[in-house]
Amino acid sequence: MLIRLRLKNLYSFKDAEFSMIASSSERIHSHHIYPARNRNDVRLNRFSAVYGANAAGKSNLVKALDFAQRLVLRSLPPEEKIPVQRFLLDPECAKKRPARFVIEIKHQGRLYEYGFECDQDRIYREWLYTFTRKTEQLLFERRTDPNDTTEVELKPTTSLPTKDQEFDPKFLEFVAKGTRPNQLYLRECIERNAKTFAAPYNWFRNTLTILNPTSYPQYLELGIQGDEAYRAFLNQILPASDTGISSLRTEKIKWDTREGELAREALREIPDPQTSALICLRIGSDTRFTIINDEQSTLLKLVTTHRDSNNKEVPFEIHQESAGTQQLLDLTPMMYELMVSKEERVFVVDEVGRSLHPHLARHLVELHLDSAHQKQPSQLITTTHETNLLDLDLLRRDEIWFVEKQPEGATDIYSLHDFKPRYDKDVLKDYLQGRYGAIPFLGDFLSLAPKDTNKSRFTPS
């Protein structure tokens, strides 16, 4: 689970902190909290909504996590630049100071802090700690100087999971010496089969899922075809959401058809497609395929059905559904995981309600928070403009966050809890009135209107 995120000189963040730690002074919605196991553990919120004006930096919070996840999970070619974007509106930050990413996580009952500092050329510093509320223990610290010489400090510990306790300092130092300047030591350890520090890597790989407006969930077609429980969940939630959809199914497409040729052309653009068990293709805005890399290379297409006036099912292509229905479909694998998964899951969604009706967006949040009664080890973090969620009957004060652009262009992030509004306060009204910031300061739009209102600018002269 995500505990805390600290960002320096990264995207629009000059120095910012976001936290999922549950405040001890909050007295409402205690079932939203994932409880601490003991005095050394932390209590964590299961949900956070992040508000702010357009271009204030909400999406950059998601981008920062996405950047770190990609850097951890993927190796860069030796000469490739690190795709980091520093804070560009301060020349000192943009050209001379490295970006800094620090994340605190809870994984398999243990607390870790993992961080790194980098520019486009190299990782200057990288570290991993395990900690409790009172103590911290260094596991490794890697440093790379401007001459690309890498050194690592290693600290043996018995606090790692049993299966990861094989601590061979000579081999780990050898791995550090072979770590390229643009490569994370954490990633290099995994590639060299040194699993001593695998916990944060496994968290980024198996626990964290990031969904942005262009994401396409890979489980949708596969789940419909092979997971009866997931299919039943879909066939309940879609009619209940008033989409008009009576059911979902997949159709097998032959490769020698026009649709098969479209999929084949798109497949040529994917490097090493045989390395993936499942390949999802989105061709323009109209066509979506899933390829299962089995013996037959099965090609699937998702189809919805609606009932006509004679109660007969009529098939529809996905592109014939509304944007809101398509987003709902894209979110259903996440919703299902949040409700039923026994594994730790953290979903970070950029603009969860961008095409959904406000009532439906609220219902999805309620569904996740109600599943908290079942003690699911899951979190949902979303950026949003959906003000229907700004309600203390629904959320805790420390579950509501705001981002605001400062005069120098940097993004500030803070919680509603900092303002300590009364529990009976209409926080939606106060937010729209600007009491908490994070709203746009608009100029005089009326002054932009043409002075001659009798003549349209589009009317031929």
Mark where each language-model region is:
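Short Pro/Gly-enriched beta-strand edge/turn motifs at strand-loop
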Residues: I82-F87, I283-D286, T382-E386
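Extended helical coiled-coil dimerization/tether regions that scaffold
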Residues: S215-Q320, R435, D444-S461
